[in-house]
Design a protein with these regions (language model features):
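N-terminal helical cap/lid subdomain that shapes the substrate entry/recognition surface
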Residues: 1-93, 106
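Conserved SAM-binding loop
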Residues: 5, 34, 79, 97-100, ...
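Conserved catalytic-core motifs of eukaryotic protein kinase domains, centered on the activation segment
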Residues: 10, 101, 110
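N-terminal start-of-chain detector that recognizes signal peptides
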Residues: 16-18, 68-70, 96-98, 127-128, ...
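Conserved phosphate-binding/catalytic loop of the ribokinase/pfkB sugar-kinase fold
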Residues: 74-76, 99, 115
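Asp-based, Mg2+/Mn2+-dependent phosphohydrolase catalytic module
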Residues: 88-91, 104-205
Length: 205
């Protein structure tokens, strides 16, 4: 969802930066933000801190990051360019669509409702629905099952490397969206095509 349907990556980056500043933590690598993209926040926390974190602390810090994110995005977030028109085209052709996201159910419903996109999807699978986050394929396999489409017949749009890995492990085709990673990185991860957004994207893609 983030970076594919909703243009929210800058707000997430700012929220993680605020959390690290609050904790007085300096990331081990300058591109620390990439460690978080596409992952549930509870799984991103130990990667950012560079140490083992127990479940209680992971949830506490993930909740704090969420507070920062909601503060930064309180005035709303835009949809990724062209996504609404593309979803209209899919609906006109009766193509079933699902969301498979590492975001929470509450944030997913809130953001997609605000943008008028939630009703476009036959199924929404979120962080609460899976035992293992991306790059594990579980979220994508659950989404495919929910819309009754074989994984090999699914096409995924992903901006995150771990998301591309998850979709590929699920046996799905993937198109990369360059809102978070560079084209070369997405192609190395296994996407078959790369787009900047949904302007000019048509179905079949």
């Amino acid at each position: 969802m983030d970076g594919v349907l909703v243009d929210s990556n800058a707000h997430h980056r700012g929220a993680w930066r605020a959390l690290l500043d609050e904790l007085g933590v300096t990331p081990a690598q300058p591109e620390y933000w990439w460690l978080t993209i596409g992952r549930p926040s509870t799984e991103a926390v130990p990667l950012l801190l560079g140490r083992v974190v127990d479940i209680a602390e992971a949830h506490r810090l993930a909740d704090r990051k969420l507070e920062h994110y909601r503060r930064l995005s309180r005035h709303g977030l835009p949809a990724v360019r062209g996504v609404s028109a593309f979803l209209d085209e899919l609906a006109a052709q009766s193509v079933p669509c699902a969301v498979a996201t590492s975001a929470t159910r509450g944030d997913t419903d809130l953001l997609l409702n605000r943008l008028g996109l939630l009703e476009r999807f036959a199924a929404v699978v979120t962080a609460e629905d899976v035992r293992r986050g991306k790059p594990d394929p579980e979220v994508y396999l659950l989404a495919a099952r929910a819309i009754r489409i074989e994984p090999s017949d699914c096409l995924v749009f992903e901006d995150a490397i771990v998301g591309v890995q998850a979709a590929r492990r699920a046996g799905m085709r993937v198109i990369g969206v360059t809102t978070a990673h560079r084209e070369t990185e997405l192609r190395t991860a296994g996407v078959e095509r790369v787009v900047a957004d949904f302007e000019g994207v048509t179905w079949p893609a």
